[in-house]
Amino acid sequence: MKTFPILALLAIVATTATTAVRVPVPQLQLQNPSQQQPQEQVPLVQEQQFQGQQQPFPPQQPYPQPQPFPSQQPYLQLQPFPQPQLPYPQPQPFRPQQPYPQPQPQYSQPQQPISQQQQQQQQQQQQQQQILQQILQQQLIPCRDVVLQQHNIAHGSSQVLQESTYQLVQQLCCQQLWQIPEQSRCQAIHNVVHAIILHQQHHHHQQQQQQQQQQPLSQVSFQQPQQQYPSGQGFFQPSQQNPQAQGSFQPQQLPQFEEIRNLALQTLPAMCNVYIPPYCTIAPFGIFGTN
């Protein structure tokens, strides 16, 4: 009988103990899932956040919205520029440049007075040359004698002026060259050369006459040149028997002309301290000869 209550108490204690033991077990089980659930839910929330953040990237609709740039219809609308080019081809009436070819006869017409002006200029130049030649015929005799003196000395001729006379001739020559314009000095040099050649021709002609006079049997007769070398008259007035002295040179006289011209260009400018144009050294043969 005593064992029964003891067993009953043991049963009660066992039941209470089992209940007491069972109660914390479910609490631990509840705590474990609760701890695991937040751990599992956190990455889900983060993934949702990343997914929520990544969602704005696909909606890049504002960038495709500025697709009006490829549409560039406003620029295509600006195609009226080829259309307004019509007025530009329309003002092509400027092409009829008829007024320009029309005034051409006007230019051809005034060419006639230009030719008249050229004739007048040529006449004036001829008149000036004639006046200058007349002046040179009277004034350049001293310069001719200076150059002839240097030529005779270079060739060992006996026809040499005295020193006092030569100094006076030098002074007179320089005075005349100083009065001649610079543009006319080249012509003056050529006239001096021409006068020297004529003088040499005249001297050679006189020598031939003297030789012929020494031959009594010679039937060849020469007329004396008419005032070929008058005193104070400047250049010679050649006779009709000496056509080469009429202001024109023969080709065989070219070396003689060049020699005397070079001598004159070396002597006169340095002696008188005057400027001679450079073209005077290359002027054509006989272009400034007297007529």
Swiss-Prot record:
<feature type="compositionally biased region" description="Low complexity">
    <location>
        <begin position="227"/>
        <end position="237"/>
    </location>
</feature>
<keyword id="KW-0020">Allergen</keyword>
<feature type="compositionally biased region" description="Pro residues">
    <location>
        <begin position="56"/>
        <end position="71"/>
    </location>
</feature>
<feature type="compositionally biased region" description="Polar residues">
    <location>
        <begin position="238"/>
        <end position="250"/>
    </location>
</feature>
<dbReference type="InterPro" id="IPR016140">
    <property type="entry name" value="Bifunc_inhib/LTP/seed_store"/>
</dbReference>
<feature type="compositionally biased region" description="Low complexity">
    <location>
        <begin position="32"/>
        <end position="55"/>
    </location>
</feature>
<keyword id="KW-0708">Seed storage protein</keyword>
<keyword id="KW-0732">Signal</keyword>
<protein>
    <recommendedName>
        <fullName>Alpha/beta-gliadin A-II</fullName>
    </recommendedName>
</protein>
<dbReference type="InterPro" id="IPR036312">
    <property type="entry name" value="Bifun_inhib/LTP/seed_sf"/>
</dbReference>
<dbReference type="Pfam" id="PF13016">
    <property type="entry name" value="Gliadin"/>
</dbReference>
<feature type="region of interest" description="Disordered">
    <location>
        <begin position="32"/>
        <end position="120"/>
    </location>
</feature>
<comment type="similarity">
    <text>Belongs to the gliadin/glutenin family.</text>
</comment>
<feature type="signal peptide">
    <location>
        <begin position="1"/>
        <end position="20"/>
    </location>
</feature>
<feature type="compositionally biased region" description="Pro residues">
    <location>
        <begin position="81"/>
        <end position="104"/>
    </location>
</feature>
<dbReference type="InterPro" id="IPR001954">
    <property type="entry name" value="Glia_glutenin"/>
</dbReference>
<feature type="region of interest" description="Disordered">
    <location>
        <begin position="227"/>
        <end position="250"/>
    </location>
</feature>
<comment type="function">
    <text>Gliadin is the major seed storage protein in wheat.</text>
</comment>
<keyword id="KW-0758">Storage protein</keyword>
<keyword id="KW-0677">Repeat</keyword>
<dbReference type="GO" id="GO:0045735">
    <property type="term" value="F:nutrient reservoir activity"/>
</dbReference>
<feature type="compositionally biased region" description="Low complexity">
    <location>
        <begin position="105"/>
        <end position="120"/>
    </location>
</feature>
